[in-house]
Amino acid sequence: TCEVLGEVTGDGRFVVHDEKDDTTPVDLDLAKVLGGIPQKTFTDERRKQKLYPLALPRCETKKEAVADALYRVLQNIAVGSKRFLVNKVDRSVTGLIAQQQCCGPLHLPVSDVAVVAQSHFGLTGAATAIGEQPIKMLIDPEAGARMAVAEALTNIMCARISALQDIKCSANWMWAPKLPGEGSAMYDAACAMRDLMVLLGIAVDGGKDSLS
């Protein structure tokens, strides 16, 4: 289930009504705020992808084949070490960090979840996890979006969360929608992610985009 905060009426006004005391603290004419800004229209068309089976180059020896395969796998940033990003920031600000990115005696950046305490003496806090599926997005944008949500949820399960409905997501879109077919692919991915989140009872309450 999802909370309904309001409805779009199309009358050009932003109205907040308080049912408790039957008052209307906000009744704003959007034309005075937006100043007649023309609505943008984006046009794109879906393009069927031409997908080919994975083909690895032939190597003369098994040693070369293993080395080549390892090199290709480690080029994927989701597989390689995040140390280049983790080591350059302070990971103990406020003194409330209960779980940071690095784990164990070797201080390896392999943690699935980050945990910040609410106080120095309490047993509650906030947990953060990430889900990213760029490779799957290239093959199937809708499936990739659902898998990104699933990855974030399986990562955050390492922390004892209060309830599934308490999870709020920040959706960050790194896409090139100006390329032919990419705008519609991003739209399909967003719809797939929305449908899954509605089904699970979680929601997006923020985010950013990089859509150059």
Question: Where do the model's predicted regions map?
Answer:
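Glycine/proline-enriched, intrinsically flexible loops and inter-domain linkers
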Residues: 1-212
